[in-house]
């Protein structure tokens, strides 16, 4: 009789054989990704090479510590992997030092806070209602609980960052750390001006480039490398890698602090299979094809924004410099939640999003956030995004007219045709 361990480790035994419930859930998710248009700005389609690395035997290896200084034996090959990830990341962003161990962008930010701040210190970040991220000092987040959080905003008229307000708040509150970054800001950031303001109050400047990393690597968005004391990012989104985080800098002293903050400060053993997948993604991003891809990502976002505006929809800031397009639904008297639910039923996934100075609850919102990275990976071009804008408008008009169930059914068939023309995996 075969014992359990023999059955589990028999190479002939697949996931389907061992755990059909999980297998079927994964298969259903694959079919969802294949049959829907993924317009969530923080999502992308990782390559098979990235996923192969993440599903590798490195899953089995515990490697607490850093290269050459592990607390476990048998780490010579995972050292090779981590070293490649670091070298490639530094080359990608033209920096000297990198930590590739953070499990997420949020933990990368926490590592910076642990490196530079003590509880009660003042930080200055973009308000979440104006496009900032939870970890930039939002009240429900630890960054808003541990530190005195001052939030800057955007200009009410243009919806662009109000750098004069950033400077005024910095001079008034003397923050120890200024954060330049966002999760829902479609335009370019003036990292040079941020650094000038930071220098005036002797503050550190953290650039959180989680959304813009791929664009920066490809030269389609300004790089903070010359200006920020320290930079954090995720490795998925526009970098098209596994879900994870990184911290990079040109300052050796800050790098050493980050090393200690990540381990042993915040984490134990790194996820070596994920670090391997990060390394693969960095290699992909260093290839000329990646620059061409990112160029199309930005072009497609501009086309999407323009097409939505032609339908009479209000696009925040009037356009985009990135992969992000934000739509304000207040003129249509619709909520983000109502619209996103209808769009999903029609086969288009995006996310509800607060718009500047939104009075709706975060669970409802008055806007939508779209991103073009995933569907550009799929192969969609400008003309396809014009059609997608038409489909989005059809759904929104259906909501306004109260016949959205009929519209959703029609749009879903059109979405299926696009997806069939551009298959994934």
Curated annotation (Swiss-Prot):
One of its GO terms (biological process) is tetrahydrofolate interconversion. It catalyses: (6R)-5,10-methylene-5,6,7,8-tetrahydrofolate + glycine + H2O = (6S)-5,6,7,8-tetrahydrofolate + L-serine. Signal peptide: none annotated. Its cofactor is pyridoxal 5'-phosphate. Pathway: One-carbon metabolism; tetrahydrofolate interconversion; Amino-acid biosynthesis; glycine biosynthesis; glycine from L-serine: step 1/1. Gene3D superfamilies: Aspartate Aminotransferase, domain 1, Type I PLP-dependent aspartate aminotransferase-like (Major domain). It is an enzyme of class 2 (transferase). GO terms for molecular function: glycine hydroxymethyltransferase activity; pyridoxal phosphate binding. Keywords: Amino-acid biosynthesis, Cytoplasm, One-carbon metabolism, Pyridoxal phosphate, Transferase. The record marks 236 as: Plays an important role in substrate specificity. Its EC number is 2.1.2.1. It comes from the Bacteria. CDD domains: SHMT (cd00378). (6S)-5,6,7,8-tetrahydrofolate binds at residues 132-134. GO terms for cellular component: cytosol. Homodimer. Belongs to the SHMT family. Catalyzes the reversible interconversion of serine and glycine with tetrahydrofolate (THF) serving as the one-carbon carrier. This reaction serves as the major source of one-carbon groups required for the biosynthesis of purines, thymidylate, methionine, and other important biomolecules. Also exhibits THF-independent aldolase activity toward beta-hydroxyamino acids, producing glycine and aldehydes, via a retro-aldol mechanism. This is Serine hydroxymethyltransferase. It comes from Wolbachia sp. subsp. Brugia malayi (strain TRS). The lineage of its organism: Bacteria, Pseudomonadati, Pseudomonadota, Alphaproteobacteria, Rickettsiales.
């Amino acid at each position: 009789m075969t014992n359990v361990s023999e059955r589990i480790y028999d190479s002939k035994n697949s996931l389907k054989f061992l755990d059909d419930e999980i297998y079927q859930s994964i298969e259903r998710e694959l079919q969802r990704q294949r049959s829907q248009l993924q317009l969530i700005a923080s999502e992308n389609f990782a390559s098979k090479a990235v996923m192969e690395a993440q599903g590798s035997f490195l899953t089995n290896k515990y490697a607490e510590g850093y290269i050459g200084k592990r607390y476990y034996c048998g780490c010579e090959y995972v050292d090779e992997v981590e070293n490649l990830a670091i070298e490639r990341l530094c080359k990608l962003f033209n920096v000297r030092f990198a930590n590739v161990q953070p499990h997420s962008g949020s933990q990368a930010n926490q590592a910076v806070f642990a490196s530079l701040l003590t509880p009660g210190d003042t930080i200055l970040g973009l308000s979440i209602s104006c496009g900032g991220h939870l970890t930039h000092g939002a009240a429900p987040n630890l960054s808003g609980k541990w530190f005195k959080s001052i939030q800057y905003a955007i200009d009410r008229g243009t919806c662009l960052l109000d750098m004069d307000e950033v400077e005024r708040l910095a001079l008034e509150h003397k923050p120890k750390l200024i954060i330049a970054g966002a999760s829902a800001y479609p335009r370019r950031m003036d990292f040079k001006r941020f650094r000038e303001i930071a220098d005036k109050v002797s503050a550190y400047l953290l650039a959180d480039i989680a959304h813009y990393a791929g664009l920066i690597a490809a030269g389609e968005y300004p790089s903070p490398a010359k200006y920020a004391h320290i930079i954090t990012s995720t490795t998925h989104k526009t970098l098209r890698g596994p879900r994870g985080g990184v911290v990079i800098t040109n300052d050796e002293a800050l790098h050493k602090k980050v090393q200690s903050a990540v381990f042993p400060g915040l984490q134990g053993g790194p996820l070596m299979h994920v670090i391997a997948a990060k390394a693969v993604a960095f290699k992909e991003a260093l290839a000329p094809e990646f620059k061409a891809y990112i160029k199309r990502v930005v072009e497609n976002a501009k086309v999407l924004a323009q097409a939505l505006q032609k339908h009479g929809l209000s696009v925040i800031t009037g356009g985009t410099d990135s992969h992000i397009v934000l739509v304000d639904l207040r003129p249509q008297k619709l909520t983000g939640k109502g619209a996103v639910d209808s769009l999903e039923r029609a086969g288009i996934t995006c996310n509800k999003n607060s718009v500047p100075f939104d009075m709706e609850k975060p669970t409802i919102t008055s806007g939508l956030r779209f991103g073009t990275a995933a569907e550009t990976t799929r192969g969609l071009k400008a003309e396809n995004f014009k059609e997608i804008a038409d489909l989005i408008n059809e759904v929104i008009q259906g909501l306004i007219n109260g016949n959205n169930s009929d519209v959703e059914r029609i749009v879903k068939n059109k979405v299926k045709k696009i997806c069939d023309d551009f298959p994934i995996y």
